[in-house]
Swiss-Prot record:
DNA ligase that catalyzes the formation of phosphodiester linkages between 5'-phosphoryl and 3'-hydroxyl groups in double-stranded DNA using NAD as a coenzyme and as the energy source for the reaction. It is essential for DNA replication and repair of damaged DNA. The lineage of its organism: Bacteria, Bacillati, Cyanobacteriota, Cyanophyceae, Nostocales. This is DNA ligase. The active site is at 117 (n6-amp-lysine intermediate). InterPro entries: BRCT_dom, BRCT_dom_sf, DisA/LigA_HHH, DNA_ligase, DNA_ligase_AS, DNA_ligase_CS, DNAligase_adenylation, DNAligase_N. Residues 599-677 form the BRCT domain. Zn(2+) binds at residues 414, 417, 432, 437. Keywords: DNA damage, DNA repair, DNA replication, Ligase, Magnesium, Manganese, Metal-binding, NAD, Zinc. The keyword Magnesium applies. NAD(+) binds at residues 35-39, 84-85, 115, 138, 177, 296, 320. Its cofactor is Mg(2+); Mn(2+). NCBIfam families: dnlj, PRK07956.1.
Length: 677
């Protein structure tokens, strides 16, 4: 189809509007456009590009997420090496670094730029004539991997630089840190835990692993963020080039990058030391991980004079915070069996205080990790924990190893049911594949009754264990065959308790199809994925008969999830389970229409809510469901992006923060009035 002049102009205008909106939302944290308007403009641009593929450009907002997974990452050589930084661990070592560089040059006054050291993964970005053409991992500093397709999904990285005259610049290279905000990291691990997947040990590992995903759709879902900190420009008039690190940070912001707002220009090492001490405690309140302070000489002229060693720039140093580490003794290595059959080794240790909590257990993940550490019962180990990170064994102090220790070997049979275990090709996890294994059954029932699934009140771990051990339940479908008489066989189960439990189980039949789908515990399917699947396939019959390729085509569903769902419905026992649940009266189809206003827009579309305190009549989950049903979003913490705070009795710090930010507050009654208008 031949494009008209007006269509070309419209495409250019749409790109400009969408790029401005993305910058305002993801970089400036000051939205200028409603989500619904953004979506409408995005769809219009997408449609025009489909009709006129010759108009598609690499910097178009539609090109952030690739259609197909990559098959491999290609090695690329960095134009300018990404050096490591020399480390200092206290103020004395910082002073020693300062004395070393001063011996290299004539006596001079110097300014320092102090920046928080973000605990993520370094990446290098290359722009030609203002357009992003390459993103690469740090690698060994000389050679990295081309991850351009994944870098495009990071919304705080501009696809086109926002700076007058930048399109005439031959090449711009930007370095920075890709990282996972703590709230996002927590959500990802919760999803992985519910889906029976191995948890990420910390946000840094999660960020690095995400950047190396072959499927950019998975990268997009994980919502990486980015702070820029280094700028190299070629082909630009000298007068326009920054002469100091401070000016470079300002220029990066003008170009459209997020720069960490907590950097400081210091006139002395004493100022640097104060900055370091301040953030040693304040960093715990940040929404991302930081493990130190990076100090750079501000003057580029001075940096050029000092140059580099074989490994480090002489003009910069990383002043690290001491890690939360402590030695302790491994008293036992237990092996747990999860609801997906995964065998997870667990180090049981002598209790030790770390990050304000008592740590006595740490996951060892799998047999590969055990072999890597060469950890044994009786070993003295260094265990680490910082903030909300999962406790991990960092290393074994082999000099303190008792003479009679033996290498730990993962069991060849399930420690619960005794059946042989398997380790599939390409997987690090060993699994019990016995569908009747009590551990798998108990885990699947706990998952079924959990808050995000069928939300059956009064069914905790102890009751689940009793139901399985007494032979009353052999699958989740058996819950719907329970009677008060049969429940009397359980310990501490009176008539009133039994009746309440039967009522709670019956009430779960009203839960929507998306929750039932999540409750089935299909591997890799978390609550968000279940929602996506249930929106596409509005009944179980549609999903069970869907082709794997069609499932994979859903935005947000990758190849791994699609394969898992497709294979689950091919198993006869699972088909029988679906039939029993259907016969029991559970909702295996969407029956409600999506509520819309007269103009077709959801009432709360694009609005972000936070709920605090105890509401008069509604539970928090009920409020969340009402808001989401009307197109709104509910988050756990108050920020500049929050539109409304729904306030109940005994509201705490969230109310204070909302008042400080000038965020509107609603009572339960006011919220219901908005929904009923």
């Amino acid at each position: 189809m031949i494009q008209t002049h007006s269509e070309v102009k419209r495409v250019e205008e749409l790109r400009r509007l969408l790029q401005q909106a993305s910058y305002a939302y993801y970089v400036s944290d000051a939205p200028i456009m409603e989500d619904a308007v953004y979506d409408q403009l995005y769809r219009e641009l997408q449609q025009l590009e489909i009709q006129h593929p010759e108009l598609v450009t690499p910097d178009s907002p539609t090109q952030r997420i690739g259609e197909r997974p990559a098959t491999q990452f290609l090695s690329v050589r960095h134009n300018i090496p990404l050096y490591s930084l020399e480390n200092a661990f206290n103020v004395e070592e910082l002073q020693a670094w300062d004395q070393r560089w001063r011996r290299q040059v004539a006596p001079t006054e110097a300014e320092y730029v102090a920046e928080l050291k973000i605990d993520g993964s370094a990446i290098a970005l290359t722009y030609q004539n203002g357009i992003l053409v390459r993103g690469a991992t740090r690698g060994d500093g000389v050679t990295g991997e081309d991850i351009t397709q994944n870098v495009r999904t990071i919304r705080s990285i501009p696809l086109r630089l926002n700076f007058d005259g930048i399109e005439k610049v031959e090449k711009v290279e930007v370095r920075g840190e890709a990282f996972l905000p703590l709230e996002v990291f927590k959500q990802i691990n919760e999803e992985r835990q519910k889906a029976g997947e191995q948890l990420f040990a910390n946000p840094r590992n999660a960020a690095a692993g995400t950047l190396r995903q072959l499927d950019s759709r998975i990268v997009a879902r994980r919502r990486l963020d980015f702070f820029a900190y280094t700028l190299h420009i070629s082909g630009m008039d000298d007068a326009s080039i920054a002469n100091t690190q401070w000016e470079a940070l300002e220029l990066l912001q003008k170009m459209g990058f997020r720069v960490n707002p907590n950097h400081k220009l210091c006139q002395s090492l004493a100022e640097v030391a104060d900055y370091y001490k301040y953030w040693d405690t304040e960093r715990l309140n940040l929404p991302y991980m930081t493990d130190g302070v990076v100090l750079k000489l501000n003057s580029f002229k001075l940096q050029e004079q000092l140059g580099f060693t074989q490994r480090f720039p002489r003009w910069a140093v990383a002043l690290k915070y001491p890690a939360e580490e402590a030695p302790t003794r491994v008293e036992n290595i237990a092996v747990n069996v999860g609801r997906t059959g995964a065998l997870t080794p667990l180090a049981q240790m002598r209790p030790v205080q770390l990050a304000g909590t008592t740590v006595s257990r740490a996951t060892l993940h799998n047999s590969d990790r055990i072999a890597q550490l060469d950890i044994r019962i009786g070993d003295t180990v260094i265990v680490r924990k910082a903030g909300e990170i999962i406790p991990e064994v960092v290393r074994v102090i082999k000099e303190l190893r008792p003479a009679d220790t033996q290498p730990f070997i993962m069991p060849t049979h399930c420690p619960v049911c005794g059946q042989p275990v398997v380790r599939e090709t390409g997987e690090a996890v060993t699994r019990c594949v016995n569908a009747s294994c009590p551990a798998i059954l108990k885990g699947s029932i706990e998952h079924w009754v959990s808050r995000d699934a069928l939300d059956i009140k009064g069914v905790g771990e102890k009751l689940v264990y009793q139901l399985v051990d007494k032979g009353l339940v052999h699958s989740v479908a058996d819950l719907y065959d329970l009677t008060t008489e049969r429940l009397f066989a359980l310990e501490r189960m009176g008539e009133k308790s039994a009746q309440k439990l039967i009522e709670a189980i019956a009430q779960s039949k009203n839960q929507p199809w998306s929750r039932v789908l999540y409750g089935l515990g299909i591997r890799h399917v978390g609550s968000v994925n279940a929602q996506l699947l249930s929106e596409k396939y509005r009944a179980v019959a549609e999903l069970s008969s869907a082709k794997q390729s069609d499932i994979e085509g859903i935005y947000g569903i990758g190849a791994e999830i699609a394969q898992s769902v497709y294979q689950w419905f091919r198993i006869n026992a699972n088909q029988s389970l679906i039939e029993r649940l259907q016969a029991a009266g559970l909702k295996l189809a969407n029956t409600e229409e999506i509520p819309v206003m007269n103009n077709g827009i959801l009432k709360l579309n694009g609005k972000t809510f936070v709920v605090t305190g105890t509401l008069p009549t509604l539970k928090r989950d009920e409020v969340k469901a009402l808001i989401q049903k009307a197109g709104g979003k509910v988050t756990d913490s108050v920020s500049k992006k929050t539109d409304y705070l729904v306030v109940g009795e005994d509201a705490g710090s969230k109310l204070e923060k909302a008042q400080a930010l000038g965020i509107a507050q609603l009572t339960e009654t006011q919220l219901l009035e908005i929904l009923e208008e």
